[in-house]
């Protein structure tokens, strides 16, 4: 498992166009900073009542990780690997392999391309992260029973607005966040607001990279 300091240095080197805050939170949720983390995707037809759709593995060595990958491939299941959990169906898109994706820097390089593509297609950080997770801008915002009824963006750190109490005078912090987010996440010219890029179904397009919007500035915005 990589330390926070080690990951930050690696992210700056290998995924320079993604803000370190964003890379950090995605890695935390996706792999817990374990470069050998694996998630096996169980087809619905094979699940029994109560079964989860994903089985997670956290081997301690690359050799053990490759053995697990071989077992998963023998079952013809899809899977995702490494720090940023690159999905097996995307290996061909980026001319890579599971073994290469267990290299932290190589994994970050691929995730950078996907995150940039998703962010530019989605037009803002929420839709971009949903795209990275699921292949569309909406699924990542919906609660999932496999994850204690939390959504992907909640697990990343975004919280839905608290509507339980109707304050006469609202929070100044909420107003500041809303103003900052409004100014920061306006879609760039030419961005496709209804993007459909993903680790699973991405049709990748090359373009000049620009730094992705900082996650810290967007946390807790109303969704």
Regions found by a protein language model. Give the residues of each.
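N-terminal secretory targeting signals
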Residues: 1-20, 154, 158-223
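Catalytic glycan-binding domains that act on GlcNAc-containing polysaccharides
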Residues: 2-164
């Amino acid at each position: 498992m990589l330390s926070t300091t080690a990951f930050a240095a690696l992210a700056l080197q290998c995924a320079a166009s993604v803000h370190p805050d964003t890379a950090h939170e995605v890695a935390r949720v996706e792999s817990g900073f374990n470069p050998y983390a694996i998630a096996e995707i169980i087809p619905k037809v094979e699940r029994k009542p109560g079964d989860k759709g994903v089985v997670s593995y956290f081997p301690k060595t690359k050799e053990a990780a490759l053995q697990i990958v071989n077992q998963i491939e023998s079952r013809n299941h899809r899977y995702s690997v490494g720090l940023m959990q690159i999905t097996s169906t995307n290996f061909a898109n980026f001319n890579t392999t599971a073994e290469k994706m267990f290299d932290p820097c190589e994994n970050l390089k691929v995730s950078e391309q996907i995150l940039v593509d998703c962010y530019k297609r989605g037009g803002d950080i929420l839709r971009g992260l949903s795209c990275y997770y699921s292949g569309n801008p909406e699924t990542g915002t919906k609660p999932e029973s496999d994850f204690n009824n939390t959504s992907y963006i909640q697990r990343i750190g975004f919280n839905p607005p608290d509507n339980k109490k109707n304050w006469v005078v609202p929070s100044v912090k909420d107003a500041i966040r809303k103003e900052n987010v409004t100014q920061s996440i306006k879609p760039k010219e030419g961005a496709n607001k209804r993007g459909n890029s993903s680790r699973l179904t991405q049709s990748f397009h090359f373009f000049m990279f620009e730094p992705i919007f900082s996650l810290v500035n967007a946390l807790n915005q109303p969704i």
